[in-house]
């Protein structure tokens, strides 16, 4: 493979402002949506809940629960009883004050891997030009995994997230201002904003 990225989008649903993503998927939207409107257009306006797991004999499995998407009863993963899901609406509302102040505009959002990863990306209003005249945009990314072993990740990135690979590149980048919160902790939006 010589370090090349495999072009796999794994997009379940998405919405985007601006240029059509390379895979041609998603609903095109205007760049003036509120975070909640973007969530709805990206069709990630669903919730998750933990549900007990039982054996065929009716015995409850200790210390484990199914993480279920309530809109269609899809089991997203099996997690521990101390795992705290973050609802998509809470993730999108993280952007509300920045969008309302005019500092950012919602840019892309969606669901990957059948709902196991949800992301929201806002474009920061200020960009800059490189010496050759190329404009560099900056984005603010919120990735909300509904998957055991993955942390909530909030960061600034120069990468426009539109698929699994661009999300992976953003999350693997070093040097970006970022905050990770594990699902065994409570997510406190104001603390994350302070830490950024």
List where the protein language model places each region:
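Feature for intrinsically disordered/low-complexity regulatory segments and propeptides
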Residues: 1-94, 103
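Intrinsic disorder/low-complexity polar-acidic segments
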Residues: 93-94, 100-196
């Amino acid at each position: 493979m010589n370090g090349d990225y495999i072009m796999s989008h794994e997009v379940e649903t998405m919405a985007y402002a601006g240029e059509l993503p390379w895979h041609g998927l998603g609903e095109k939207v205007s760049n003036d949506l509120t975070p909640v409107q973007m969530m709805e257009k990206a069709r990630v306006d669903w919730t998750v809940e933990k549900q007990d797991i039982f054996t065929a004999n009716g015995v409850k499995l200790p210390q484990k629960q199914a993480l279920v998407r309530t809109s269609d009863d899809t089991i997203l993963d099996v997690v521990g009883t101390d795992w705290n899901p973050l609802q998509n609406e809470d993730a999108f509302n993280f952007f509300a004050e920045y969008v309302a102040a005019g500092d950012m505009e919602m840019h892309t959002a969606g669901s990957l891997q059948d709902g196991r990863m949800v992301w929201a990306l806002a474009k920061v209003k200020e960009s800059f030009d490189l010496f050759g005249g190329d404009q560099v945009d900056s984005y603010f990314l919120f990735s909300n995994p509904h998957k055991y072993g993955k942390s909530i990740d909030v960061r600034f990135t120069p990468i426009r997230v539109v698929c699994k690979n661009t999300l992976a590149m953003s999350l693997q980048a070093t040097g970006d201002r970022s905050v990770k919160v594990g699902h065994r902790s409570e997510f406190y939006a104001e603390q994350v904003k302070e830490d950024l």
